[in-house]
Amino acid sequence: MFKSPFGANANPFGGASDGATVGGNAMHQVIEEEENDTVTSPTSPNFGMNAQSMFSGPFGGDASDDVLPSALRSPPNPESYPAQYNFSRRTSVSAESLKPSADTYDNWTPPVHDKTNEQLSRLKTAIAGNFLFSHLDDEQSAQILGALIEKPIPAKDIKVISQGDAGDYFYVVEKGSFDVYVNEKGTLQPGPEGMGEKVGTIQAGGSFGELALMYNAPRAATVISAEPGCTLWALDRLTFRRILMESTFSRRRMYEDFLREVPLLQTLTPYERSKIADALETQKYTPGATIIKEGDPGHSFYLLESGEADAYLGDGKESVKHYSKGDFFGELALLNDAPRAASIVATTDVKVASLGKSAFQRLLGPVEGIMRRTKYDDIKTGVEEMDPLQV
């Protein structure tokens, strides 16, 4: 007779004869075992039976106590798992990598939409103050300007994006304003109240729609025109990811490398360093422009991203220190508001990344704690000097 515990006429509890009814004591024993049993995956190397168990083998029945079934003598082949093996196991949800280099578009070239000089002039004005474009180099800026396409919005209350929809474009507002609505149910609902609560308004120079493109997620809000005669510029999803996100990741890596060289911040953890890198703001200066002025209160710390600059004391005509890519200055502004010890003047086109004291403290707390970690005693950088911090 077939002895499998799950076969016909078999006793799954092993103790009684075939076809017998299991008594209350046996059932009580099984319940006690289940209560005290530690669940172990059958694919783990230490899987086995409790020595006190009434079951003979790892799956009950007539299996031998000292010989494991052949399926357990070697690591299991994933392809041989039963069809129902993963039925109740958790599954993972994946999206596109946020790292643009993971995208494989070897032959990709940015689209180009012809524009008149008047359109280009308007577009440059529209994106001039947008933080997403502030760190782009000249080539990337030209690619963005070429890829953007004009979208006139002639009337009020036109839906540009709807909450819950898939994201396909990123938008820059050139003219007019747009209201933002969020429904707590996560999607646009039917009826006059279906858009949910108004949470904000986007004015000229602002932008929207980037989150759905960055995270491959549904639109998080509904955006409608708040007045007639609005103008948008739209950037397609692929160009957004390839140019804007690629430049963002490259800039973050560069800033993190710069921050590693700042003595004041050398003990930051990688996570703290990435937070600071994301908070840095890009500013540009033309040759001869003053970046910081001697005697002014110090509120920000600067990393020289590109270009060159010189430091001058008083009315001196000779530089007392030269700065190039990767150098930093003004870091003591993170500690106190003492006046600047020198003036820093751009000698070429310069791009700097700045971080204010308030932003630093908001992210990492008082800088004194970082300095105690760093043991910043007797360190002098740039043209600024400081009293050693007593620790």
From Swiss-Prot:
Residues 1-84 are annotated as: Disordered. SUPFAM superfamilies: cAMP-binding domain-like (SSF51206). The modification Phosphoserine is found at residue 92. The keyword Nucleotide-binding applies. Belongs to the cAMP-dependent kinase regulatory chain family. Residues 38-55 have a biased composition (Polar residues). GO terms for molecular function: cAMP binding; cAMP-dependent protein kinase inhibitor activity; protein kinase A catalytic subunit binding. Residues 1-131 are annotated as: Dimerization and phosphorylation. The keyword S-adenosyl-L-methionine does not apply. This is cAMP-dependent protein kinase regulatory subunit. 3',5'-cyclic AMP 1 binds at residues 132-261. PROSITE patterns: CNMP_BINDING_1, CNMP_BINDING_2, CNMP_BINDING_3. It comes from the Eukaryota. GO terms for cellular component: cAMP-dependent protein kinase complex; cytosol; nucleus. Tetramer, composed of 2 regulatory (R) and 2 catalytic (C) subunits. In the presence of cAMP it dissociates into 2 active monomeric C subunits and an R dimer. Gene3D superfamilies: Jelly Rolls (2.60.120.10). Keywords: cAMP, cAMP-binding, Nucleotide-binding, Phosphoprotein, Repeat. 3',5'-cyclic AMP 2 binds at residues 264-381.
